[in-house]
Curated annotation (Swiss-Prot):
S-adenosyl-L-methionine binds at residues 76, 97, 125-126. Pathway: Quinol/quinone metabolism; menaquinone biosynthesis; menaquinol from 1,4-dihydroxy-2-naphthoate: step 2/2; Cofactor biosynthesis; ubiquinone biosynthesis. Belongs to the class I-like SAM-binding methyltransferase superfamily. MenG/UbiE family. Coiled coil: none annotated. This is Ubiquinone/menaquinone biosynthesis C-methyltransferase UbiE. It comes from the Bacteria. GO terms for molecular function: 2-methoxy-6-polyprenyl-1,4-benzoquinol methyltransferase activity; demethylmenaquinone methyltransferase activity.
Amino acid sequence: MNQPGETTHFGFRDVPLNDKQTMVNDVFHSVASRYDLMNDLMSGGMHRLWKDVMITTLNPPRDDAPFRLLDVAGGTGDISFRAAKASGAGFQATVCDINTDMLEVGRQRAVQRHLDGQVDFVEGNAEALQFPDRSYDAYTIAFGIRNVPRIDLALKEAYRVLKPGSRFLCLEFSSVDVPGLNKIYDLFSFKVIPEIGRVVTGDAESYQYLVESIRKFPKPYDFAEMMRDAGFARVNWQMMSGGIVALHSGWRL
């Protein structure tokens, strides 16, 4: 239960905890139709390679064995579509997102890709999932968990809905650890990305928030400790592209 006056960060600003989710929702309502295009422009297409590593690590079965994936904050369906392509006939994915505009983009793309029979889209909150205990074979979240007001609750919910022996994978921006690259990365992040957002979507402010939210996300070792506190075992992470992103992994045993 939230305490009176409790605050959290929204980018570099402190805001009332109860207000953050609405503010994040407004950001993604604004950028939904151009979200994947902006990912290409902001990352130079690298997000595709990072997501491929995530799917390779997920390693879904390629035969007819049933496999249920929960893809949280996966609105446009990108991760689930990639997982479906790498899977056999037993694959089913549920894309859960709190933003209805992002979900609608995903639904349309699922139909275009003839994947609407394997991938379904539901509105839901990562902090209070509506799914039964021990009901999924894997949980993925890509570039989404930093937008959750209470990350600890989202991790506990992830653990709850996973079957024993199932895996949690989180792809998220991290801390650049290559000397020199960090300065270039900061310059690109704070000067270039908001301007790209302004030109492509007419909304620089939302991308300013997204850049700031990356800097506020816990360091990999701190996030790993949060995962352990939620119950996950065999926790580790893999840094990519000089520390721009990290793929975090944990198991419910």
